[in-house]
């Protein structure tokens, strides 16, 4: 995508409409905006349940991807303190994003959400923080916006082709010894490509979300890179090389090709703080 131009553009009237809607939401026209796309089960439970999907009524196999919005308050408020407006996106969500900071806006629940504004916000945001729920697609795919993926699972399906992207995965805990799996163990235990909750359960793995601090760290890395204030440490290049050397380009179980050119960076602070994970 980074090699092709953006083809979706707004008319002058649409831009005027978008600016007017921003004002209603309480956001200045030239504000810096970060979108927050955090998955829970509400969308499939409520929106899809109302549709005629005869082939599937039970969506719980997706539950391994669920995330707690409370873990995103810290990063939202820190970004707000830095001058960013943070908008929590979503058509249907389980619980509100609770913050007293007026620059942290629970757009999914403020009765001002529209399909048009979803796309308009995607076009003007600085970057997206996403759990890989699909809500990031307009910003990332249509407008080539940078994205920070957190709690991303399955790790072998990271969107490595997206330039200016960062990622960290959930912690994989063994139910046998209650220890966290290393990256190599995630791959060798065949859970790196699990796409159903049952798959993790059958392989004796429980997923634990990234901490608010881990989420904040990788988001700050994005901010610093976008503002040309990022200072890498001498160890970073080695850690990235080690991670991507371990990361398979094909699915271990059947050789299916998953990745081509790697354009993504794994969270630098996460790797610095968890060097054991790469052993």
Predicted regions and their residues:
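Leloir-type glycosyltransferase catalytic cores
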Residues: 1-24, 163-279
